[in-house]
Amino acid sequence: MAAIVFGLARRVRVPSLVQRHSSTTVLGLFAFVNGVVAIGLMAAAAVVTGAPFIFPSLGPTAFLLFYTPLLPAACPRNTLGGHAIGAAAGYLSLVLFGLTHNAPALVEGVAWGRVGAAALSLGLTSGAMVWARVPHPPAGATTLIVSLGILREPWQLGVLMVGVALLVVQGFVINRVAGIDYPAWAPRPGVG
């Protein structure tokens, strides 16, 4: 079975398909199929484990990985680093504003402490990603997911990062099988 899959993968490579068909059609189909597979696998992992393997910022991350995989924002270093910064900044903001034991903002509403935590988390995430040279826009959503209390337990943040890592592995494998020179870690020089 593996030989069949790899044989098909060699024959149906995205760059060669783009040469024969509309690039918008091929890339749209590639993004569609891989978005379904990536988020479907994460959602299945969430159902099986009862852990939050699926969260809103995985959606834009998957889109970057499968539509613009060669942009710096989609490389593994920026994806993992950006989400780690976002999760850490969100949690630090919860701690500083005394909100670690509060219900999520969607349940208890938004009070001034939550305003401060959300604003601080996004500011910290934005600045730290620039300073660390790991820009990944979906991490802005990750930090708000945490600072708004949707995921607020340290173990949930660990699961969040495992989910991001699994998505990066999927992105690497799927893009490479499709013939796309997706980077192993850092962005390619001169790309983006």
Each PLM stretch: what is its role?
Residues 42, 125, 143:
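Generic structural marker for isolated residues within well-ordered, non-membrane alpha-helices
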Residues 54-59, 136-142:
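Transmembrane helix boundary and interhelical junction motifs in multipass membrane proteins
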Residues 70-79, 128-139:
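Membrane-helix interface "capping/anchor" motifs
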Residues 94, 128-132, 141-148:
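Generic transmembrane alpha-helix signature in multi-pass membrane proteins
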Residues 101-136:
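Internal alpha-helical transmembrane segments of multi-pass membrane proteins
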